[in-house]
């Protein structure tokens, strides 16, 4: 399952919509909730990012992300 994670690069400042970034993770999970939990754990272990939202991408959404040219799965 591919998850899109919206985050701020630091927890020191209050979040601003204009500074929100995203990354994509390929998580092997049985349920959507389990995948979200695993994604959060991976990011918290490897970065100091302030996670705003974790979204499971549908097939259509994944196709769109690939078409925009910004899609790249992040590996830690």
From Swiss-Prot:
Catalytic activity: RNA(n) + a ribonucleoside 5'-triphosphate = RNA(n+1) + diphosphate
Function description: A non-essential component of RNA polymerase (RNAP).
NCBIfam families in alphabetical order: PRK13667.1
EC number: 2.7.7.6
Broad enzyme group: transferase
Protein name per Swiss-Prot or TrEMBL: DNA-directed RNA polymerase subunit epsilon
GO biological process terms, semicolon-separated: DNA-templated transcription
């Amino acid at each position: 399952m591919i998850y899109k994670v919206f985050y701020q690069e630091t927890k020191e400042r209050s979040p601003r919509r204009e500074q929100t970034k995203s990354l994509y993770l390929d998580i092997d999970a049985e349920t959507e909730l389990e995948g979200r939990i695993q994604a959060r754990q991976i990011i918290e272990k490897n970065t100091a990012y302030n996670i705003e939202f974790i979204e499971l991408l549908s097939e259509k959404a994944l196709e769109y992300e690939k078409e925009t040219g910004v899609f790249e799965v992040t590996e830690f």
